[in-house]
Regions:
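Serine-dependent protease modules
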Residues: 1-129
């Protein structure tokens, strides 16, 4: 998670950087929201959202993230299973995660919260350990 830092910098694939501010997070879904400062929206391209319900076991996917601090890394794999669920225990109780996509693409610390995309580059999931 990104909460608790004093400064946030977002680097685009062309090397352009933007300062950002923390808006909020949801630890249970492994997501944070940040807001870019002084960004020209006309120069930003949002990711296309795919339909994860149309995924098939055996379909190629890519996990995007910064594993072990290695920025803008991509690993590939296939959809191994769909609609997986698991329970995680913590000091605050149990949390059940359902409808997960299982992939054999390498997911390492730093990939959490990153995009899982299909072979069209559409977002179909969020990586989590």
């Amino acid at each position: 998670m990104v909460d608790g830092y004093d400064q946030y910098v977002v680097t685009m694939d062309d090397g352009t950087t933007y300062e950002a501010e923390f808006v909020g997070n949801d630890a249970s879904s492994d997501l944070a929201v940040i807001k870019l400062k002084d960004a020209d929206a006309s120069k930003l391209t949002p990711i296309e959202i795919g339909d994860s319900s149309k995924l098939n076991v055996g379909e190629w996917v890519m996990a995007i993230g910064s594993p072990f601090g290695n920025e803008q890394s991509v690993s590939t794999g296939i959809v191994s299973a769909l609609y997986r669920s698991t329970a995680m225990s913590s000091t605050s109780g149990n949390t059940i995660y359902a409808n997960m996509i299982q992939t054999d693409a390498a997911i390492n610390p730093g990939n959490s919260g990153g995009a899982l995309v299909n072979d069209n580059g559409e977002l179909v999931g969020i990586n989590s350990l």
